[in-house]
């Protein structure tokens, strides 16, 4: 306890630096999942991908990043196991951030796409096992988290298969694929915007003071989705778009439409990634800051400091700009 009282401010500053390091590594490495395919397909260049991803990663981290942070902060280990030794929890969280941040940067330097979530959860579990033991781990919560690592790829594969089959039947296997793509492309745009808005409004905007009911969230999201669909219809019917398509009888026009859809979904994925993975950096930081601010109190709900979320968002954007190119190239063209 004396450690926290005497060196509390220094510990917060050091943890903030380590949190920024972790966010830097996440931005540099994990963003390849969002933009690598767009680069590999030739839709955009690596430089364009970095600029686009920075914008949406930052937006996702700030607007919708607070929800997952609570899980990293107190959903993996039992905070009450450290009630009588809060300094151990503080030092353990700092060690976890340092280890995870260094590993992500090393992996990025080597061009290896790795998971920031796996890294930080493993680090937190490791320090808890060494200091307190297996009783400090919330195994039920952890089982759900680990289960999602297996369920998510399966669900993503199923959804991707359904969308692909749907696209083939509605667009590619028709006699006029370009005409069909112009017809159904705006629908895909609207669905993407609808999902993005639902997640952002319902999960992320509470920390900026916007609390809406389920029906209000649904209505706003549906309205924005319809607007996006209408914009898509108008653009695909415009002379500007027609002039960009050289072969209207073949698949070049279809590729042009799907390149726009791919870019839109990549932006949505970057936003979702920012909202989810920023928690890996700020969760431990939020825990340390709250414990020191409350004089060593570990248990009970805590309010996240206002500066924590923006710090993680900026760190992710900075890491993406400085080191994101190598991993993005691996996913885009190296696999």
Q: Which functions belong to the PLM regions below?
A:
Residues 1-335:
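Alpha-helical transmembrane segments and immediately membrane-proximal extracytoplasmic
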């Amino acid at each position: 306890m004396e450690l926290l009282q005497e060196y509390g401010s220094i510990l917060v500053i050091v943890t903030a630096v380590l949190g920024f390091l972790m966010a830097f590594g996440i931005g540099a490495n994990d963003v390849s999942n969002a933009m690598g395919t767009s680069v590999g397909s030739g839709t955009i260049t690596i430089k364009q991908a970095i600029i686009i991803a920075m914008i949406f990663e930052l937006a996702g981290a700030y607007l919708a990043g607070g929800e997952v942070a609570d899980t990293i902060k107190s959903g993996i280990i039992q905070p009450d196991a450290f009630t009588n030794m809060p300094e151990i929890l503080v030092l353990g969280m700092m060690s976890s951030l340092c280890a995870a941040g260094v590993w992500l940067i090393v992996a990025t330097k080597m061009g290896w796409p790795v998971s920031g979530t796996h890294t930080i959860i493993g680090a937190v579990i490791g320090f808890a096992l060494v200091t307190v033991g297996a009783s400090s781990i919330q195994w039920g919560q952890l089982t759900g988290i680990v289960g999602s690592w297996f369920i998510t790829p399966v669900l993503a594969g199923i959804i991707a298969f359904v969308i692909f089959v749907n696209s083939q039947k509605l667009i590619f296997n028709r006699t006029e694929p370009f005409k069909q793509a112009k017809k159904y492309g705006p629908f895909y745009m609207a669905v993407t915007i609808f999902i993005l808005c639902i997640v952002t409004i319902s999960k992320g905007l509470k920390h900026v003071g916007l609390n809406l009911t389920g029906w209000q969230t649904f209505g706003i999201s549906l309205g924005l989705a319809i607007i996006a669909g209408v914009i898509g219809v108008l653009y695909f019917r415009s002379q500007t778009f027609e002039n960009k398509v050289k072969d209207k009888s073949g698949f070049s026009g279809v590729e042009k439409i799907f390149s726009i859809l791919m870019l839109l979904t990549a932006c949505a994925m970057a936003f979702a990634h920012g909202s989810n993975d920023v928690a890996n950096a700020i969760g431990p930081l939020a825990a340390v800051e709250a414990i020191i601010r409350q004089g060593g109190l570990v248990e009970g709900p805590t309010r996240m400091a206002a500066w924590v979320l923006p710090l993680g968002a900026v760190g992710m954007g900075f890491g993406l700009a400085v080191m994101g190119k190598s991993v993005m190239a691996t996913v885009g063209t190296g696999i």
